[in-house]
Amino acid sequence: MTTRKDSELEGVTLLGNQGTNYLFDYSPEVLESFPNKHENRDYFVKFNCPEFTSLCPKTGQPDFATIYISYIPDKKMVESKSLKLYLFSFRNHGDFHEDCMNIIMNDLIELMDPRYIEVWGKFTPRGGISIDPYTNYGKPGTKYEKMAEYRMMNHDLYPETIDNR
Protein backbone atom coordinates (compact mmCIF):
# COMPACT_ATOMS: atom_id res chain seq x y z
CA MET A 1 0.00 0.00 0.00
CA THR A 2 1.32 3.43 -0.89
CA THR A 3 0.57 6.82 0.61
CA ARG A 4 1.65 8.59 -2.59
CA LYS A 5 -0.86 9.66 -5.23
CA ASP A 6 -0.10 9.02 -8.90
CA SER A 7 0.05 12.78 -9.42
CA GLU A 8 2.92 12.98 -6.91
CA LEU A 9 4.91 10.44 -8.91
CA GLU A 10 4.37 11.92 -12.38
CA GLY A 11 7.95 13.19 -12.63
CA VAL A 12 9.45 9.89 -11.44
CA THR A 13 10.07 7.96 -14.66
CA LEU A 14 13.33 6.08 -14.04
CA LEU A 15 12.44 4.13 -10.90
CA GLY A 16 11.16 0.69 -11.90
CA ASN A 17 12.04 1.27 -15.56
CA GLN A 18 13.61 -1.91 -16.96
CA GLY A 19 14.92 -0.10 -20.06
CA THR A 20 17.26 2.27 -18.23
CA ASN A 21 19.62 4.17 -20.51
CA TYR A 22 23.03 4.59 -18.86
CA LEU A 23 24.59 7.88 -19.93
CA PHE A 24 28.38 8.17 -19.95
CA ASP A 25 28.58 11.94 -20.37
CA TYR A 26 27.56 14.60 -17.87
CA SER A 27 23.75 14.71 -17.94
CA PRO A 28 22.01 16.89 -15.32
CA GLU A 29 18.71 16.50 -17.18
CA VAL A 30 18.44 12.92 -15.86
CA LEU A 31 17.74 14.21 -12.32
CA GLU A 32 14.15 13.80 -11.15
CA SER A 33 12.32 15.03 -8.07
CA PHE A 34 9.15 14.28 -6.15
CA PRO A 35 7.16 16.24 -3.54
CA ASN A 36 8.28 16.28 0.09
CA LYS A 37 5.27 15.13 2.11
CA HIS A 38 6.85 16.32 5.37
CA GLU A 39 7.83 19.90 4.60
CA ASN A 40 6.41 20.95 7.98
CA ARG A 41 9.57 19.63 9.71
CA ASP A 42 13.31 19.66 9.25
CA TYR A 43 15.06 16.37 8.62
CA PHE A 44 18.23 15.27 6.89
CA VAL A 45 18.37 12.97 3.89
CA LYS A 46 21.84 11.49 3.35
CA PHE A 47 23.17 9.64 0.33
CA ASN A 48 26.41 7.66 0.58
CA CYS A 49 27.79 7.19 -2.93
CA PRO A 50 30.91 4.98 -2.81
CA GLU A 51 31.33 4.41 -6.56
CA PHE A 52 31.74 7.93 -7.99
CA THR A 53 34.16 8.27 -10.90
CA SER A 54 35.22 11.15 -13.11
CA LEU A 55 38.26 11.99 -15.22
CA CYS A 56 41.18 14.33 -14.64
CA PRO A 57 40.68 17.23 -17.08
CA LYS A 58 44.40 17.35 -17.92
CA THR A 59 45.53 13.71 -18.07
CA GLY A 60 42.25 11.88 -18.64
CA GLN A 61 43.12 9.48 -15.80
CA PRO A 62 40.19 8.18 -13.76
CA ASP A 63 39.46 9.54 -10.30
CA PHE A 64 37.46 7.59 -7.73
CA ALA A 65 35.61 8.88 -4.68
CA THR A 66 32.98 8.27 -2.08
CA ILE A 67 30.57 11.18 -2.13
CA TYR A 68 28.31 12.13 0.76
CA ILE A 69 25.28 14.24 -0.11
CA SER A 70 23.18 15.47 2.83
CA TYR A 71 20.28 17.85 2.57
CA ILE A 72 17.26 19.24 4.37
CA PRO A 73 14.45 19.22 1.82
CA ASP A 74 11.91 21.97 1.35
CA LYS A 75 9.16 21.25 -1.18
CA LYS A 76 11.02 18.74 -3.40
CA MET A 77 13.30 15.75 -2.96
CA VAL A 78 15.67 14.05 -5.39
CA GLU A 79 14.69 10.58 -6.59
CA SER A 80 17.53 8.15 -5.78
CA LYS A 81 17.70 6.19 -9.04
CA SER A 82 17.92 9.42 -11.02
CA LEU A 83 20.69 10.56 -8.65
CA LYS A 84 22.55 7.29 -9.27
CA LEU A 85 22.30 7.74 -13.04
CA TYR A 86 23.30 11.40 -12.75
CA LEU A 87 26.42 10.55 -10.73
CA PHE A 88 27.19 7.76 -13.22
CA SER A 89 27.10 10.38 -15.99
CA PHE A 90 30.33 11.88 -14.60
CA ARG A 91 32.21 8.74 -15.71
CA ASN A 92 33.61 10.41 -18.85
CA HIS A 93 33.42 13.96 -17.51
CA GLY A 94 36.76 15.73 -17.17
CA ASP A 95 36.89 18.15 -14.25
CA PHE A 96 38.84 18.74 -11.06
CA HIS A 97 37.52 17.20 -7.84
CA GLU A 98 36.49 20.57 -6.44
CA ASP A 99 34.59 21.42 -9.62
CA CYS A 100 32.69 18.12 -9.62
CA MET A 101 31.45 18.64 -6.04
CA ASN A 102 30.29 22.19 -6.80
CA ILE A 103 28.60 21.13 -10.04
CA ILE A 104 26.73 18.37 -8.19
CA MET A 105 25.62 20.76 -5.47
CA ASN A 106 24.53 23.43 -7.97
CA ASP A 107 22.51 20.91 -10.00
CA LEU A 108 20.76 19.62 -6.87
CA ILE A 109 19.99 23.17 -5.72
CA GLU A 110 18.49 23.92 -9.13
CA LEU A 111 16.42 20.71 -9.01
CA MET A 112 15.12 20.88 -5.44
CA ASP A 113 15.76 24.32 -3.93
CA PRO A 114 16.55 22.64 -0.57
CA ARG A 115 16.67 24.45 2.75
CA TYR A 116 20.23 23.19 3.24
CA ILE A 117 22.62 20.94 1.31
CA GLU A 118 26.21 19.76 1.57
CA VAL A 119 28.31 17.66 -0.78
CA TRP A 120 31.57 16.10 0.40
CA GLY A 121 33.84 14.11 -1.87
CA LYS A 122 36.50 11.82 -0.44
CA PHE A 123 38.73 10.94 -3.36
CA THR A 124 41.22 8.09 -3.37
CA PRO A 125 44.87 9.17 -3.52
CA ARG A 126 46.65 9.79 -6.78
CA GLY A 127 50.29 10.74 -6.61
CA GLY A 128 50.23 10.18 -2.85
CA ILE A 129 47.61 12.89 -2.16
CA SER A 130 43.91 12.50 -1.48
CA ILE A 131 41.59 15.46 -1.99
CA ASP A 132 38.38 15.88 0.01
CA PRO A 133 36.42 18.88 -1.30
CA TYR A 134 33.45 20.00 0.79
CA THR A 135 30.81 22.48 -0.32
CA ASN A 136 27.54 23.55 1.24
CA TYR A 137 24.64 25.95 0.89
CA GLY A 138 21.91 27.32 3.14
CA LYS A 139 18.89 29.13 1.75
CA PRO A 140 19.68 32.88 1.94
CA GLY A 141 17.89 34.89 4.61
CA THR A 142 17.01 31.80 6.67
CA LYS A 143 18.50 30.00 9.65
CA TYR A 144 19.97 27.52 7.14
CA GLU A 145 22.28 30.21 5.79
CA LYS A 146 23.79 30.54 9.28
CA MET A 147 23.88 26.76 9.59
CA ALA A 148 25.88 26.55 6.36
CA GLU A 149 28.39 29.10 7.65
CA TYR A 150 28.77 27.21 10.94
CA ARG A 151 29.16 23.81 9.28
CA MET A 152 31.67 25.22 6.80
CA MET A 153 33.84 26.55 9.62
CA ASN A 154 33.62 23.33 11.63
CA HIS A 155 33.12 20.54 9.12
CA ASP A 156 36.56 18.93 9.40
CA LEU A 157 38.14 20.07 12.65
CA TYR A 158 39.06 16.51 13.55
CA PRO A 159 39.82 14.73 10.27
CA GLU A 160 39.98 10.97 10.18
CA THR A 161 43.26 9.11 9.97
CA ILE A 162 43.96 8.44 6.31
CA ASP A 163 44.58 4.74 5.83
CA ASN A 164 44.87 4.86 2.03
CA ARG A 165 41.07 4.64 2.04
Curated annotation (Swiss-Prot):
GO terms for biological process: queuosine biosynthetic process; tRNA modification. Pathway: tRNA modification; tRNA-queuosine biosynthesis. It is found in: Cytoplasm. Keywords: Cytoplasm, NADP, Oxidoreductase, Queuosine biosynthesis. It catalyses: 7-aminomethyl-7-carbaguanine + 2 NADP(+) = 7-cyano-7-deazaguanine + 2 NADPH + 3 H(+). Catalyzes the NADPH-dependent reduction of 7-cyano-7-deazaguanine (preQ0) to 7-aminomethyl-7-deazaguanine (preQ1). This is NADPH-dependent 7-cyano-7-deazaguanine reductase.
